[in-house]
Curated annotation (Swiss-Prot):
STAS domain sequence ranges: 389-478
Highest classification ranks of the organism: Bacteria, Bacillati, Bacillota, Bacilli, Bacillales
UniProt KW NADP keyword: no
Protein known as: Putative sulfate transporter YbaR
GO molecular function: secondary active sulfate transmembrane transporter activity
Location of the protein in the cell: Cell membrane
Membrane topology: Multi-pass membrane protein
Family that this chain belongs to: Belongs to the SLC26A/SulP transporter (TC 2.A.53) family.
Main location: membrane
Originating organism: Bacillus subtilis (strain 168)
Keywords of this entry: Cell membrane, Membrane, Transmembrane, Transmembrane helix, Transport
Length: 478
């Protein structure tokens, strides 16, 4: 990949496209933020304030230019019971603590753990997210009139056909503007952004959560904050990796982790809910040409401008146009080549990808899908490397040599122990471990057990060819 942009390039190297992409993202953020607020059981303005604050702060402190962060559904799901049981002020306190935890994790270089997520899990994550984005649009069609479908079709035509003639302005932005003008001019009876929830023109202001500063409060919010911190970082770092690949650039994921934390701390003090990177909006931004920090900054700033100044216009935007944008995102996000790859890839990789997708879709939780995928990959990997190759041959009537090739650890010791002939009319056995490695106490104990079993039969057993690390472990466990 190319080297990361300089700070100047990150802000001003792509001004026109970053501004236009940011405007498009701001428009697409509104129904998302409102919808996620409803999921969390809070006022729509809480999600909108969060999206504004997080987008602005992450544009400054984040480690992945061009990535969009705001209020998200995965975070909203975690908050539901906290809001229901303890109220909004505890949510603000939990959001601040979430940010503090994320900053600490960022300083601890948590992003290093990303290397343990296999490609098959990444592909499963992306495909599952595409399915979730698409399925999230389906409720908009319940009881919809023909005009809804007509505007959806018209929006999709603009989105996919306009780029053939010009790319000066993002086609999804043109689709939203054109459909809004048509809906307002001809009084088309379609569902609008205003139907999603009440949007006031008030700006966020600084506040300190009205909760007791006691250990009991910490006991209440800490479990939620831990969950929010890890879910947020997982989704953010995976999204950063995807945008890295889409743009062929590098990102500083530890800086991104710290940036997410700072953004959530600020958000909590301004009446917002915890958020993280949004892959859907990030893909919209990337496909619209957004590459720099300016795109995220414009998205946050324009979102607040829309709320504070143009809320009377925003509420008239037809949902059909925004649904069309999200359909475009879901189609563009899905890795269609992975379907062909199912037959070509190793069976275990295909199983991991499919299981990851199914887990996410069934649970509606990206973090659970990734966890199951990584766990399954680990099981398959352990099964693969636990296979030992053991060859034996008799040197003479008194000596037999065993050559062991492979990894000796907890998963391979049963096969190892059963591979030897303990009752044989010989005097001496040599176990050649030149091409083997002892990894843990299970492996060391198994070798000791093998030697002891030969000794019980009056046969002398010698371990030969242990490498330095294996020999050290054997001495340590003796």
């Amino acid at each position: 990949m190319n080297n990361s942009f300089t700070l100047k390039q990150q802000w001003f190297g792509n001004i026109r496209k970053d501004i236009l992409a940011g405007i498009l993202v701001a428009l697409a953020l509104i129904p998302e933020a409102i919808g996620f607020s409803i999921i969390a059981g809070v006022d729509p303005m809480v999600g909108l304030y969060a999206s504004f604050c997080i987008a602005i702060i992450i544009s400054i402190f984040g480690g992945r230019p061009g990535m969009i962060s705001a209020a998200t559904g995965s975070m909203a799901v975690v908050m539901v019971s906290l809001v229901a049981d303890h109220g909004l002020q505890y949510l603000f306190a939990a959001t601040i603590l979430t940010g503090i935890i994320q900053v600490i994790l960022g300083i601890s270089k948590i992003a290093r753990l990303m290397k343990f997520i296999p490609r098959s899990v990444m592909i499963g994550f992306v495909n599952a997210l595409a399915i979730l984005i698409f399925s999230a649009q389906l409720p908009q069609f319940e009881g919809a009139s023909w005009s809804m479908y007509a505007m959806l079709a018209g929006s999709l035509v603009i989105i996919y056909v306009l780029p053939r003639f010009t790319t000066a302005v993002p086609s999804p932005l043109v689709a939203i503007i054109v459909m809004t003008i048509i809906a307002v001019t001809f009084h088309v009876d379609v569902r609008t952004v205003g139907d999603m929830g009440n949007i006031s023109s008030s700006l966020p202001h600084f506040l300190i959560p009205d909760v007791p500063f006691t250990f009991e409060t910490l006991q209440i919010i800490f479990p939620y904050s831990i969950a929010l911190a890890f879910v947020g970082l997982l989704e953010s770092l995976l999204t950063a990796q995807i945008i890295d690949e889409m743009t062929d650039t590098d990102s500083d994921k530890n800086k991104e982790s710290r940036g997410q934390g700072i953004a959530n701390i600020v958000t909590g003090f301004f009446g917002g809910m915890a958020g993280c990177a949004m892959i859907g909006q990030s893909v919209i931004n990337t496909k619209a040409g957004g590459r720099g920090r300016l795109s995220a900054f414009v998205a946050g700033a324009f979102l607040m401008f829309l709320i504070a100044v143009l809320s009377h216009v925003v509420v008239k935007i037809p949902m059909a146009a925004l649904v069309a944008v999200m359909v475009m995102v879901s189609v563009g996000t899905f890795d269609w080549s992975s379907l062909k790859g199912l037959k070509k890839a190793p069976l275990t990789d295909s199983i991991v990808m499919v299981v990851t997708v199914v887990t996410v879709v069934v649970t509606d939780d990206l973090s659970k899908g990734v966890f199951v995928g990584v766990l399954l990959s680990a099981v398959f990997f352990v099964a693969k490397i636990s296979k030992l190759k053991i060859v034996s041959h008799a040197e003479d009537q008194k000596l037999r040599t065993y050559q062991v090739k492979g990894q000796i650890f907890f998963a391979s010791v049963t096969d190892l122990t059963n591979a030897f002939i303990y009752q044989e009319d010989i005097e001496r056995v040599v176990i050649d471990l030149t091409e083997a490695h002892v990894w843990d106490d299970s492996g060391a104990a198994a070798l000791d057990k093998i030697v002891a079993k030969f000794k019980e039969q009056g046969i002398e057993a010698e371990l030969k060819g242990l490498n330095k690390a294996s020999k050290s472990l054997m001495k340590q466990m003796a």
